[in-house]
Amino acid sequence: MSSSKRIAKELSDLERDPPTSCSAGPVGDDLYHWQASIMGPADSPYAGGVFFLSIHFPTDYPFKPPKISFTTKIYHPNINANGNICLDILKDQWSPALTLSKVLLSICSLLTDANPDDPLVPEIAHIYKTDRPKYEATAREWTKKYAV
């Protein structure tokens, strides 16, 4: 199956059965460039926010993972100022069996359960580990400022 057929199939699956609190689709007519949105999980400091992500599929998808980055600013130990996401399934744990739907759900759960032991932003990870109320207050502040 070619990458464009696989991407088209994932798009129709997403439209038919969208994952909770996520949506995604192509930007214009470019099947290899998508935009996604994730609703901040209710049980997280990101509640009430809508976060946008940019998705670029490589031409050898699904043998290589999509490149996904946040375009909405977010305060999180695993997401840096450029919107890059530190998530194992987007790197060495990628498998062609994974779908964009599963990846979006993994990003959603990263918002609820950060991984401060594998941080992209060590300063935020340190605050997350040593002063959780301060971390949550700052994350809520950024959510109100950039994602509402």
UniProtKB/Swiss-Prot annotation:
Belongs to the ubiquitin-conjugating enzyme family. It comes from the Eukaryota. This is Ubiquitin-conjugating enzyme E2 4. Pathway: Protein modification; protein ubiquitination. Residues 7-18 have a biased composition (Basic and acidic residues). GO terms for biological process: cellular response to heat; cytoplasm protein quality control by the ubiquitin-proteasome system; mitochondria-associated ubiquitin-dependent protein catabolic process; protein polyubiquitination; rescue of stalled ribosome; ribosome-associated ubiquitin-dependent protein catabolic process; ubiquitin-dependent protein catabolic process; ubiquitin-dependent protein catabolic process via the multivesicular body sorting pathway. The N-terminus is blocked. Keywords: ATP-binding, Isopeptide bond, Nucleotide-binding, Phosphoprotein, Stress response, Transferase, Ubl conjugation, Ubl conjugation pathway. Its EC number is 2.3.2.23. The keyword Isomerase does not apply. There is a cross-link at residue 91 (Glycyl lysine isopeptide (Lys-Gly) (interchain with G-Cter in ubiquitin)). The keyword rRNA-binding does not apply. E2 ubiquitin-conjugating enzyme that catalyzes the covalent attachment of ubiquitin to other proteins. Mediates the selective degradation of short-lived and abnormal proteins. Mediates ubiquitination of PEX5. Disruption phenotype: Defective activation of the ribosome quality control (RQC) pathway. The active site is at residue 86. It catalyses: S-ubiquitinyl-[E1 ubiquitin-activating enzyme]-L-cysteine + [E2 ubiquitin-conjugating enzyme]-L-cysteine = [E1 ubiquitin-activating enzyme]-L-cysteine + S-ubiquitinyl-[E2 ubiquitin-conjugating enzyme]-L-cysteine. Residues 2-148 form the UBC core domain. Gene3D superfamilies: Ubiquitin Conjugating Enzyme. InterPro entries: UBQ-conjugat_E2_core, UBQ-conjugating_AS, UBQ-conjugating_enzyme/RWD. GO terms for molecular function: ATP binding; proteasome binding; protein-macromolecule adaptor activity; ubiquitin binding; ubiquitin conjugating enzyme activity; ubiquitin-protein transferase activity. Induction: By heat shock and cadmium. Present with 13500 molecules/cell in log phase SD medium. Residues 1-22 are annotated as: Disordered.
